[in-house]
Amino acid sequence: MRTFTLIAILTCAVLVIFHVSAAEELEAQDVIQPEDIFTGVATLEEDRIFECSFSCDIKKNGKPCTGAGEKKCSGGWRCKMNFCVKF
């Protein structure tokens, strides 16, 4: 059991080292910028927050919408607790 744990830890360490070295190589080639990583994540989170919108039927006589509609997300996302979640 200890052998398997040691193998798993070493494998994870090798994968992390490989990932970091690959990221540094791409950064050195100006393929990615370090600040772009966080900007992309923030944009995705903002899209999730605002993508979940409340849709409702407008009455024929022109009255404003009431809360009888349903929440919808676009692009294959589903609304869970007012956030769009990808399933």
From Swiss-Prot:
Its main location: secreted. It comes from Chilobrachys guangxiensis. This is U3-theraphotoxin-Cg1c. Belongs to the neurotoxin 12 (Hwtx-2) family. 03 (juruin) subfamily. Keywords: Disulfide bond, Ion channel impairing toxin, Knottin, Secreted, Signal, Toxin. InterPro entries: Hwtx-2-like. Probable ion channel inhibitor. It is found in: Secreted.
